Amino acid sequence: MYECMFFSHRLTIGFYIPLIVLTTMSSLSESLGERQKTACTVAAISCANSDTYNRTTVSNHTFFYISDRWKYSELIRYEKPTGDLRHDKLIHVDREFLDIVSLLHNNENQLRTLLTIFRSDSAPPWVKFMRGYSQCLDHPIIYTCVEEKCQQYNLEELPYGKDIFLENVVGFDLGAPPHNMSVLIAVSNTKPKITKVLRITSTSLTLFDALYNTVLTFFRSIGARNVDVVRRLILYQASLSGPHRDAPIHNYLNRDLS
């Protein structure tokens, strides 16, 4: 299922078929790093030289991902706003505004980037207000324009898929329990060479279960059971009782790591 891991102060777990990238903060001993140097290095070089994968760089870390440019993840599905939308404040031309404009201007993945910005936790009020423009029409039509070539889309009829890795997922963030999980997605514009990581909240316990089982399976397979990331995941999972989960699911790994 997985082919290699990359270790540094920032722990990166790479899965190549299918390719998944998970990130979390941790530190590991040099002896653990030595185990994966040969096979992992060969796989990484092969992947980096392949045209099969897209790649992006965030904070000097290169992430590889498989992307279907004609399909979008449910994670960034357009949600038509409800209620009375009003925006009575001035839009300030500040750094945040310029960053968003730079991401969108002449971006070949303009629609995907816009949908991600719409759903991001850090979207400013004026961006959230833009989601309601379609209320002026009877259907949510949008136009994207790149190099003066424009295309029309109906945001409610886009081909959405359940796989979150249709997007450029570079990590997950587990906040304070009982359940506060975010997916980190990198969006880029190659023309001004800008990349920004956006955070989208996920309430999916299924996604957490997959993350939990994947990480524990990997560390068990290399005999590293008592590492910080494993301990934190186990404690986090234990906090998901009560209203978040009536009973443990059947396919959970045995949590006894002794």
UniProtKB/Swiss-Prot annotation:
PROSITE patterns: GL_BHV (PS52025). Keywords: Disulfide bond, Fusion of virus membrane with host cell membrane, Fusion of virus membrane with host membrane, Glycoprotein, Host cell membrane, Host Golgi apparatus, Host membrane, Host-virus interaction, Membrane, Signal, Viral attachment to host cell, Viral attachment to host entry receptor, Viral envelope protein, Viral penetration into host cytoplasm, Virion, Virus entry into host cell. It is a peripheral membrane protein. GO terms for cellular component: host cell Golgi apparatus; host cell plasma membrane; membrane; viral envelope; virion membrane. It comes from the Viruses. One of its GO terms (biological process) is symbiont entry into host cell. HAMAP family: HSV_GL_betahv. The heterodimer glycoprotein H-glycoprotein L is required for the fusion of viral and plasma membranes leading to virus entry into the host cell. Acts as a functional inhibitor of gH and maintains gH in an inhibited form. Upon binding to host integrins, gL dissociates from gH leading to activation of the viral fusion glycoproteins gB and gH. In human cytomegalovirus, forms two distincts complexes to mediate viral entry, a trimer and a pentamer at the surface of the virion envelope. The gH-gL-gO trimer is required for infection in fibroblasts by interacting with host PDGFRA. This is Envelope glycoprotein L. It comes from Guinea pig cytomegalovirus (strain 22122). The lineage of its organism: Viruses, Duplodnaviria, Heunggongvirae, Peploviricota, Herviviricetes. The gene is gL.
